[in-house]
Amino acid sequence: MNFTDMLRAATARHGSLLCVGLDPEPARFPAGMQGDARKIYDFCAAVVDATADLVCAFKPQIAYFAAHGAEAQLERLMQHMRSNAPQVPVILDAKRGDIGATAEQYAKEAFERYGADAVTLSPFMGFDSIAPYLAYRGKGAFLLCRTSNPGGDDLQNQRLASVAGQPLLYEHLASLAQGPWNRNGQLGLVVGATYPQEIERVRSLAPTLPLLIPGVGAQGGDAAAAVRAGLRSDAPIIVNSSRTILYAGAGADFAGAARAQALRMRALLQAARR
């Protein structure tokens, strides 16, 4: 089963558009774990087990593991998700972007070392920096398009005078991803929940691509508005929430608190679908 089929199946099975982002910060762990980077796996695995039946995807952010020398814990976590939640696709949030030869190594890292079902990428260096990931048939690749951070305007909202119609950069990227770059049907786009009008614009330019929508919760994005802007019956959307769920509770039952928050978020997203 390819990534998109896995995503559709998990969305239908769990009645969910919610993705839980796994961004572990040991300083924010509950008592007994707080400040201990050796507990990254334990913390994340507990959240995964508490929410696996409520989500359409999980999204571990590689920097939160690498910063603590916890890549081995990430490998173990990926194996745990494959064993305990095999029906839920895993998106490795890596935002890689490099020349072809180096991209081949990053692709190997994402899909062979970690066994991810999809990966996030920066498309700034063009198609040849993306192609090595697409060599892994059945895997997904989400390209940064209109990101949730304010600084995204510096480049993404600039007009391209040399392109017919003078589209904004993010608009041009959406068109490329929907068209000539999507040779094997593996691409999706990252569009921040903080910009619902831009989500709607991206959806009009890329009507069939999966959209990964971060920026809900701590970043202030409107989850319901994001769903209304991006949802189509024939194209999946994934609404990511990380810190709001991970750190919903600071006590011994932090996983239970994470589940309760995930239930609330799932219900909010479901209500917006109607």
Curated annotation (Swiss-Prot):
Gene3D superfamilies given in the database record: Aldolase class I (3.20.20.70)
Carries keyword Ubl conjugation? Answer: no
Could you say which residues form the signal peptide? none
Q: Which domain of life is it from?
A: Bacteria
Q: Supply the InterPro entries for this chain.
A: Aldolase_TIM, OMPdecase_AS, OMPdecase_type-2, OMPdeCOase_dom, RibuloseP-bd_barrel
Q: What is its EC number?
A: 4.1.1.23
- The protein here is known as Orotidine 5'-phosphate decarboxylase
The organism named in the record is Verminephrobacter eiseniae (strain EF01-2)
Protein's gene: pyrF
